[in-house]
């Protein structure tokens, strides 16, 4: 874990190494100050003239200023190193996530990844800052001050041999109890972030179902769980300072008593005031260093769980990667499923897809229908290699998708996913995800083919209209049409529409399909839909059931051979007819009412 995280220091290695060296200089200067002060006290006691003490006093001031300079420089380099380390670590973590396949992403929730990129990295940054400065300073002060205390104080300094083990035992006990609590806290942070993320992204649904009170209670519960665990940890940590203060005060009382008694009994021959002063000062430095060490242990304990969570992501190997010698060009849009089986997890009891054998020629239009959970989306996800097959092979352009360069493959397979996602930016910027170099005319053409221009032209700023995160300021149908336009700009060899017109009316759906046929005549098109009207003009239609291909054929063939298809078609036609009848009835009633009103007005 440490090796994994330390790889993020990189270009900040010099300031990272410089910080402990500057701290060493600071500590050495600090250790001289009590020694010089003791000599000055002895000189004053012996009645030395001011002129005789000036060189020693000047040297003391010089040492103090030098210590200050070393400390200030260490603070600057420490801050520079820790901020740079956190920046690199955040970049490494974010870039690692970009390499993840869907299978990798399934292992970590989005809220957990956000926590690792923010809270966890902040914790590690604070710990890193303390380690390269305070964790170096405290042991050095402890060693040097302990040595000088024995040199100056002799037997009086033996008090510290009793105090230090007591403090160490108490600190170990506290850390032992606190560590598992911090581990639970970060998992509960994930739940808290998940609650916030769901509420913010689904605010319209929350309000439409009047679920504000439920969401408030859910958030309060998650926040309360975090608070309770933090409170438990803080209660244990609260014993740290009183324990330190008791030991410090007790040590000082004993030192003053023993030192004063020794001075009086020996009349200053075995122990004098200067030695007592320096022993007292060194003792204060020893105990302060112990307090700093306790703070470090607490911070490191808190950061340890964060570091493990970050390292877990950094160490995760992408389940999908480019081959050693990848194919860089997709020949055509033909697709072959050669006895493909797939399951999302090796521990899953059943296959999501079972023995799929399917061959699609380049330029063919394929419709895919099936009930919920029939693995329609799973089937098309394998084409762009969002997942790898468990058994069998998927070929695009006659080449196994595992042999392609991922960028080359996915550039030729445009997908409009079931969950339509837009990003914060203008409409034009969102559409240019399909082709960053697309001209304004090409952007407008794609929008026209997707029937998006019907509403975009109505916005005051047109294609410069700002889209909020996730497309929260446009409707579901508008979002779908923008996502289709984005895919069209790519001009791919394979276009996959995963239930991408479910939120638009049938008339607009038909216009979009006509536009696709004229704009991309040689592109292989796979259209997943719930409405048979969206796929009935396809060259072939696949009926999925339970992860298998139940039937395949054109519209007329399936009406004869597939009971599922026939029942779905009949049901949808009946619903459509009833809807049209209701509309006609409403229209006639409105007309009759209008005539009655007109007649009444005329009579009056």
Label each residue range with its predicted role.
Residues 11, 99-103, 119-128, 132, ...:
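An intracellular "coupling" helix at the cytosolic face of ABC transporter transmembrane type-1 domains
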Residues 46-58, 148-162, 171, 232-309, ...:
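Helix-loop-helix
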Residues 2, 10, 21, 25, ...:
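Hydrophobic alpha-helical transmembrane segments of ABC transporter permease domains
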Residues 21-22, 29-42, 63-110, 114, ...:
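Juxtamembrane helix-loop junctions of ABC transporter transmembrane domains
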Residues 10, 16-73, 77, 150-155, ...:
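Transmembrane helix-loop-helix hairpins at lipid-water interfaces of multipass membrane proteins
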């Amino acid at each position: 874990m440490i090796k994994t995280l330390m790889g993020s220091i990189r270009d900040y290695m010099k300031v990272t190494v410089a910080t402990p060296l500057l701290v060493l200089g600071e500590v050495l200067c600090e250790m001289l100050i009590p020694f010089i002060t003791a000599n000055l006290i002895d000189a004053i006691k012996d009645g030395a003239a001011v002129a005789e003490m000036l060189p020693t006093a000047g040297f003391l001031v010089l040492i103090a200023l030098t210590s200050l300079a070393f400390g200030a420089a260490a603070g600057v380099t420490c801050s520079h190193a820790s901020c740079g380390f956190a920046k690199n670590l955040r970049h490494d973590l974010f870039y690692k996530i970009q390499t993840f396949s869907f299978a990798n992403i399934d292992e970590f929730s989005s809220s957990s990844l956000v926590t690792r990129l923010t809270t966890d990295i902040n914790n590690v940054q604070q710990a890193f800052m303390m380690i390269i400065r305070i964790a170096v300073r405290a042991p050095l002060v402890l060693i040097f001050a302990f040595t000088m205390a024995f040199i100056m104080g002799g037997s009086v300094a033996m008090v510290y041999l009793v105090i230090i083990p007591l403090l160490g035992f108490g600190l170990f006990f506290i850390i032992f109890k606190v560590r598992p609590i911090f581990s639970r806290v970060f998992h509960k942070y994930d739940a808290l972030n998940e609650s916030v993320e769901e509420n913010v992204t689904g605010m319209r649904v929350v309000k439409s179902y009047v679920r504000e009170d439920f969401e408030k209670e859910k958030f309060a519960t998650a926040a309360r769980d975090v608070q309770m665990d933090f409170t438990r940890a803080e209660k244990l940590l609260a014993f740290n300072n009183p324990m330190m203060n008791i030991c410090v005060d007790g040590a000082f009382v004993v030192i003053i008593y023993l030192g004063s008694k020794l001075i009086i009994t020996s009349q200053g021959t075995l122990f004098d005031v200067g030695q007592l002063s320096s022993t007292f000062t060194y003792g204060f430095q020893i105990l302060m260093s112990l307090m700093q060490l306790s703070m470090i242990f607490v911070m490191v304990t808190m950061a340890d769980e964060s570091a493990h969570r970050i390292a877990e992501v950094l160490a995760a190997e992408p389940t999908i990667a480019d081959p050693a010698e990848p194919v860089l060009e997709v020949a055509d849009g033909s697709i072959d499923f050669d006895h493909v089986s797939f399951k999302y997890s090796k521990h899953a009891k059943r296959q999501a897809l079972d023995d799929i054998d399917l061959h699609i020629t380049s330029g063919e239009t394929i419709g895919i229908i099936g009930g919920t959970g029939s693995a329609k989306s799973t089937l098309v996800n394998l084409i762009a290699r969002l997942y790898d097959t468990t058994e069998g092979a998927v070929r695009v352009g006659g080449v196994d998708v595992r042999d392609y360069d991922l960028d080359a493959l996915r550039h030729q397979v445009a997908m409009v996913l079931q969950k339509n996602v837009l990003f914060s930016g203008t409409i034009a910027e969102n559409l240019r995800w399909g082709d960053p170099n697309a001209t304004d005319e090409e952007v407008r053409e794609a929008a026209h083919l997707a029937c998006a221009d019907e509403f975009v032209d109505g916005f005051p700023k047109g294609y410069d209209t700002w889209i909020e995160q996730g497309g929260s300021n446009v409707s579901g149908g508008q979002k779908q049409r923008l996502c289709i336009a984005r895919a069209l700009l790519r001009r791919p060899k394979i276009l996959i529409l995963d239930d991408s017109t479910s939120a638009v009316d049938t008339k607009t759906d038909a216009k979009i399909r006509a536009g696709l046929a004229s704009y991309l005549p040689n592109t292989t098109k796979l259209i997943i839909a719930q409405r048979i009207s969206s796929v009935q003009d396809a060259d072939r239609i696949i009926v999925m059931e339970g992860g298998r291909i139940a039937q395949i054929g054109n519209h007329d063939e399936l009406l004869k051979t597939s009971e599922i298809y026939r029942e779905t078609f009949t049901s949808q036609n009946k619903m459509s007819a009833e809807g049209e009848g209701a509309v006609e009835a409403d229209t006639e009633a409105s007309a009759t009412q209008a005539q009655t009103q007109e007649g009444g007005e005329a009579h009056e």
